[in-house]
From Swiss-Prot:
Belongs to the gluconeogenesis factor family. GO terms for cellular component: cytoplasm. This is Gluconeogenesis factor. It is found in: Cytoplasm. SUPFAM superfamilies: CofD-like. It comes from the Bacteria. CDD domains: YvcK_like. GO terms for biological process: regulation of cell shape. GO terms for molecular function: LPPG:FO 2-phospho-L-lactate transferase activity.
Amino acid sequence: MGQKPKIAIFGGGTGLSVLLRGLKHKPVDITAIVTVADDGGSSGRLRNELKIPPPGDIRNVLAALSDVEPLVEDLFQHRFNKGNDLTGHSLGNLILAAMTNITGDFFHAVTEMSKVLNVRGKVLPAANASVVLHAEMEDGRVVSGESTIPEYGQRIKRVFLTPEQIDPLPETIDVIREADLIIIGPGSLYTSILPNLLVPKIGEEVIKAPAKKVYICNVMTQPGETLHYTAADHVKALNQHMGCGFIDTILVNSEDIPDEIKRKYEMESARPVDFDIEELKAMGLEVIRDQIVTYKNDVIRHDTHKVASLLVDLLKE
């Protein structure tokens, strides 16, 4: 039997976890590279108190790729709602914090938890230490902190990380170089995706890598990040931060969003991401448009199995 094709996926937040739940059932070798810029909620508290990278996004990805009894996954994802010190904490975050203490660093903690949860694939933090995400707004102000940036309410000019000199894991560089397909997204453009690519050497290696680079565009705009952005605007922001055009293919949703769901999102200043196929093609992009969303409790999500199948099809080209 031949070696399974290798896929490297960059992201964070809910979008990445949703995609991985479908992709893990395909005959591919998955590595998820996950942001360590989160500073809100349980992750932010553990990051500040224990001086470890934020575990929340990593926890969600481990759960998505796990192959354990549903009750074990539920236990790992359980969030406490009582107790002064425990309220708001996820048990999985606490376990990752404890494992970091036991193993000596965050990367080895993630590696060991991957074994415990029988993870299909690999999960790598973008760096083995916390980073701080900053955004320079179009009004000139610099806002610091991943959770603070969307609250400022101005258009983002650029984002950057401190410390500037932070090393990616050698394993991450190897994964990028050996990948048959590199997937970027879905996820928050400025606070989940770019914090990965801005880690020194990671962006450079992605640009140089021979693998096809696929951007899975968000279905809806995000208040405080991508208000009024088109699909082309998302790609332009990625290119601007990387210093060149590096995306080969973009996956966009062609399905009309039901009016009642649109109205709900509009109440939160979010709307469907528009796309102009000719504009995207003029940027040198291969455009794949399909009905790639599902709805649950009036929340829009990428259809994990449909998107996974489309990505596997790209490996056959």
